[in-house]
Design a protein with these regions (language model features):
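Active-site phosphate/pyrophosphate-binding segments
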Residues: 525, 529-655
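Extended redox/cofactor-interaction regions of prokaryotic respiratory oxidoreductases
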Residues: 389-457, 463-465, 469-470, 495, ...
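N-terminal export/assembly segments and adjacent metallocofactor-ligating motifs
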Residues: 241-509, 680, 969-1012
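Surface/interface-facing alpha-helical segments and adjacent flexible terminal/loop regions used
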Residues: 1-245
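Phosphate/diphosphate-binding loops
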Residues: 272, 471, 697, 703-707, ...
Length: 1012
């Protein structure tokens, strides 16, 4: 092949033109606009515009934009730079995603499409210059890549390297066709709609035209070069000669650098599920050259003594969640009203200087106890952000701490009043020994509650165990495993338990010997000295004080469970021994949620199902067989603690909090309310807290809490209330390790898979820098400079107690260590085997059915000494039902772990956010399946799709908790965020969240109201 001189000159002009345009596009799309960058293009705008056909309707926008730039002053350039950042580089969702993979792949970053682009760069020894700018399939970088190729093509042409020139043109055509042309149209359409200035609007027209035109011209050029006689060549003649200054003034790579690094082979990196679901599943990331192509799960041999630790739907969705283009990307500080969501991007140095300054200022002005680390479990691990923040503040003089949790406040707090400990559960491998399992408000098929919980329930069912589910909702667990479903009205669980106990006692089905030997306060003859026998549990059942016997007929009216069903349930539980009554966390997240917790323990004691294989002591049900050590928080110099659910009270009126009314511990009063709040990777700042509207009102008052710092990976509803917002990392971008909740027989390594994108940093990394500014870095790190260092140190400490653990590197390589147990762990087996040597860890040494400690509180109406049914506020017997006739509960949806994954589009396709409503209630409101409805009470309004189904009992609606609060202009939530309607009122003893106790009404949304 020989290129004629005339052709060569013409082609060279063509290459110059293309090089100029691609550099113009690369700069316009990738670099923040400055006068220095655009001066050349402003002066030569006629050459840029001459490339567009005169009929192109984007010409006037681009021309006007460049003309305007010629008149810009400093403030106008600043405004244009902000517009560029808003469009393409905002720290969070952007109007116009600039990355190819978002359009052509799974709407995520760092996938196979990103890898394909990187492979193209590698062929030409190029790589991204600054990884903090994000993935290299940015359209601006792809235009820069085309500019580099044209420059090299010109060099080949000038040196008569015709073969190299042709190969280069082929590569350009391929890259245009395979990559840029595939998404430029969609990108440009979004740019035209989103742009607020003529320049970027015109760029949206120009780019789309240019890519189509250039692809056609390259195709014609290749036909000319290859002398394709089968087609008519229409390679365009160049009508003007471009000056040499086009190249001389502009010869650097834009966003790219030379790199001799070659492509990398795919590898599988072991990590694990880090959701706070109680599970800890094996996740294997298949990664190549910094791009995660897929995830798989445990593939080791499956055995009964060591089953596989398989991932659920949430873990399989990690890529779609954590590689989202909506990630927070850079540190930001608030510039609008708190909660408005308006931020400006700042550097890490500025962010950490500000944080250190506020930490010092607030301590000096209000004392160390005015600083608070909010309850936050956006992820679990040995190195966990909330605990790290506590460690940092403990070393800096202290902080106001909390106790309890949002998950299990009542059960963790109340169970020890009966047993002296919350560790009352048998491990799940014991389920197979049960003849009957009652899952009371327990739905592990969706909540997970330990990765293999449903595996062991399935094994029990296969061995003949009868499974009964007690729940207002026919859950996924009930559908998959239950032999029987017993729906019960929310907040009435104790009435059902009381009637069961009444039946068991009056029909002489109870284990009197067990009660006589191990229990305190069941009947008058086993009461503490000096306490009237009418205070016993038996006296309560028989109505000796209140005149009401707790019969099945009495309970049927309250609970909605037929009398005969109550009797049969009681008989089954008493006679099908060993039986396990396993409580979930839903029933205890109600008004008086402490009562069903202790009610379940009484039933277990009455039937002698405590401390035996196949039984269950009920209550909290925690186990402590194995676990991973965590980075210690250290000793807090300030002794005060509040219940975690009452932090809003501590912000609004902390000085008025007391021990009796608010559960304040460690101190008699607080000198100040919360003035500084650290919210590290969690949504209890707003979305997961009760009464969102009231919480927003408290947070918006900057005279109360003066500074809020949040670390997160998305612009969540909670993150919008930050004064300083820091971009965190995901499971793929850091080292950690963890175990499931205490029932787990394994620990998992969580190895870093890819580098953190953009300017994202693990909390530990930036907290070290804050510690440096506070003068406590050495004490904070203890010589551990990374999360990996901490994991290694903690693992080596674990090896001292567990010498069977393999070498640390082997553990990291395999990703998991499993203990193989031949026998289950049975809570209180030692007490039952030898009570004299092993009393229960209560003050009396017995199971305290009657609690002297609760009796001493002298609050029998709300905190009785024996568990009993108490009419709940906003319960079925509340007069408020005249106004709001429906009870509303929440549940943990299979698609989310609390609020994590709500922004996962694939999950939304599989599990739409919708409330469940019984056909009777729907018909009364003219609602049919699929309608949108408004749910409302005095606290707020939300709109949501309706699933009409008999799987929820009449009089009750159920809303999946965790949806992200998304208000419209009137403040009406459009996403179905349940906490718009829940209350800040806490339970009387534990001061726990009663977020499942709500009265509401529902109305169908008519078309004119904006419904779908």
């Amino acid at each position: 092949m020989t290129i004629l001189l005339q052709q060569k000159t013409e082609i060279l002009q063509f290459m110059k033109e293309r090089n100029f345009i691609y550099r113009f596009l690369a700069k316009s799309l990738f670099l923040p606009p400055t006068q220095e960058i655009f001066k050349f293009y402003i002066e030569n705008r006629h050459l840029v515009l001459s490339i567009l056909p005169e009929t192109d309707n984007g010409l006037k926008f681009l021309e006007q934009g460049l003309l305007d730039m010629a008149q810009y002053r400093a403030e106008k350039w600043q405004a244009l730079e902000k517009e560029h950042e808003r469009l393409f580089f905002n720290s969070g969702p952007v109007p116009v995603y600039p990355w190819e993979s978002v359009y052509t792949g799974e709407h995520i970053l760092y996938d196979a499409h990103t890898l394909a682009v990187k492979s193209e760069y590698r062929k030409w020894q190029l790589d991204i210059e600054d990884p903090t700018q994000g993935p290299l399939d940015h359209i601006g970088l792809e235009c820069s890549f085309m500019a580099v190729l044209t420059e090299r093509a010109m060099k080949d042409l000038a040196e008569d390297k015709e073969d190299g020139f042709v190969e280069n043109i082929k590569a350009q055509q391929h890259f245009l066709q395979a990559h840029i042309a595939g998404f430029a149209g969609l990108f440009c359409e979004k740019l035209r709609k989103a742009a607020a200035c003529d320049f970027y609007r015109g760029l949206g027209f120009f780019l789309e035209f240019w890519i189509k035109s250039d692809l056609q011209n390259l195709t014609e050029l290749l036909a000319l070069l290859l002398k394709d006689k089968s087609r008519e060549i229409k390679f365009p003649l160049r009508k003007q000669v471009l000056p040499e200054s086009f190249l001389a003034a502009d010869t650097f790579y834009i966003g790219l650098k030379h790199s001799a690094e070659t492509g990398k082979q795919m590898k599988i990196v072991p990590t694990a599920g880090r959701n706070n679901c109680g599970g800890c599943c094996v996740v294997k990331a298949h990664v190549q050259d910094g791009n995660i192509l897929k995830v798989t799960t445990d593939s080791e041999p499956d055995a009964p003594e060591s089953p596989q630790v398989r991932a659920c739907v949430r873990a399989y969705g990690y890529r779609r969640t954590f590689l989202s283009p909506d990630r927070l990307k850079y540190p930001m500080k608030r510039v609008g009203e708190r909660g408005e969501g308006k931020f400006v991007r700042i550097s890490w140095d500025e962010a950490l200087d500000l944080l250190a300054l506020e930490t010092k200022r607030i301590k000096k002005c209000y004392g160390a106890a005015s600083r608070y680390v909010n309850y936050a479990w956006g992820y679990s691990g040995a190195v966990q952000a909330m605990r790290l923040a506590k460690r940092l503040l403990a070393l800096d003089g202290g902080y106001l701490d909390f106790y309890n949790s949002y998950s299990s406040a009542c059960t963790s707090y109340a169970t020890p009043y009966t047993y002296g400990t919350k560790f009352t559960g048998n491990t799940p491998d014991d389920y197979v020994h049960s003849k009957l399992i009652i899952l009371w408000g327990h739905n592990p098929a969706e909540t997970i509650f330990g990765t293999n919980t449903t595996y062991y329930l399935k094994k029990a069912k296969e061995s003949g165990t009868k499974i009964i589910v007690v729940d207002p909702r026919y859950s996924m667990t009930a559908a998959a495993l239950a032999d029987e479903w017993i729906p019960v009205r929310p907040t009435t669980d104790n009435a059902l338990m009381d009637a069961m106990a009444y039946t068991i006692f009056t029909e002489n089905l109870h284990d009197q010997k067990f009660l006589d030997t191990f229990c305190l306060g069941f009947d008058a003859s086993h009461m503490p000295v000096g306490i009237d026998g009418k205070e016993s549990y038996c006296a309560y059942l028989l109505g000796e004080k209140d005149g009401i016997a707790k019969t099945p007929a009495w309970a049927a009216k309250i609970t909605g469970v037929p009398e005969i069903k109550i009797q049969q349930l009681a008989r089954d539980y008493a006679l099908m021994k060993p039986a396990a009554l396993i409580q979930g966390y839903g029933p205890q997240r109600h008004a008086y949620g402490e009562q069903p917790v202790r009610g379940g323990t009484v039933l277990a004691a009455m039937t002698g199902n405590v401390g035996i294989a196949g039984g269950c002591a009920s209550g909290a049900g925690a186990t402590d067989r194995h676990g991973v050590l965590s980075v210690p928080t250290g000793e807090n110099p300030f002794p005060g603690r509040i219940p975690c659910y009452l932090w809003t009270e501590a912000v609004a009126a902390g000085e008025k909090m007391s021990a009796t009314e608010h559960g304040l511990e460690g101190v008699t009063n607080l000198d100040s309310g919360i003035k500084m709040l650290w919210n590290m990777s969690g949504q209890c700042l707003l979305n997961q807290h009760g009464d969102i509207n009231k919480t927003m009102e408290i947070l918006k008052d900057t005279t109360k809490c003066e500074f809020i710092v949040c670390s997160d990976i998305f612009m969540t509803p909670s993150a919008k209330f930050a004064d300083l917002l820091l971009p965190g990392t995901t499971v793929f971008e850091e080292d950690n390790m963890r175990s499931p909740w205490g029932s787990g027989d394994y620990i998992c390594s969580m190895s870093q898979v890819i580098e953190p994108p953009f300017a994202c940093r693990p909390e530990y990394e930036w907290m070290k820098d804050v510690a440096e500014r506070l003068g406590i870095r050495e004490a904070f790190t203890e010589g551990h400079e990374s999360m990996a260092d901490w994991c290694a140190a903690l693992y080596h400490k674990m090896q001292q107690a567990h010498p069977e653990l393999p070498a640390y590197e082997k553990f990291r390589q395999r990703g998991i260590f499993k203990w193989a147990h031949t026998e289950p762990q049975i809570a209180f087996a030692a007490q039952i085997a030898d009570f004299a040597k092993n009393p229960f860890p209560t003050p009396s040494g017995k199971i305290e059915i009657f609690s002297p400690r609760l009796y001493a509180l002298n609050k029998p109406e709300e905190i009785p000494a024996v568990p009993k049914y108490i009419r709940a506020w906003e319960g079925p017997e509340d007069a408020l039902r005249e106004k709001y006739p429906l009870q509303m509960i929440g549940w943990h949806y299979a698609r989310r772990c609390h609020s994590v994954h709500d922004n996962n589009e694939a999950m939304e396709e599989a599990f739409r956010q919708e409330m469940w409503m019984n056909p009777q209630d729907a018909a009364a409101r003219n609602i049919v399946n699929g309608d949108r409805a408004e749910v409302f009470n005095d606290r707020g309004k939300m709109q949501i799709f309706v699933k009409v189904t008999p799987r929820i009992m009449p009089g009750v609606i159920s809303v999946p908790q965790g949806a992200w609060f998304s208000p419209d202009g009137k403040g009406i939530d459009q996403r179905g965020s349940i906490n718009v309607l829940t209350s800040l009122k806490a339970t009387p003893l534990a001061k726990g969240n009663a977020q499942h106790t709500n009265l509401v009404d529902v109305k169908k949304i008519q078309c004119e109201e904006g419904g779908a």
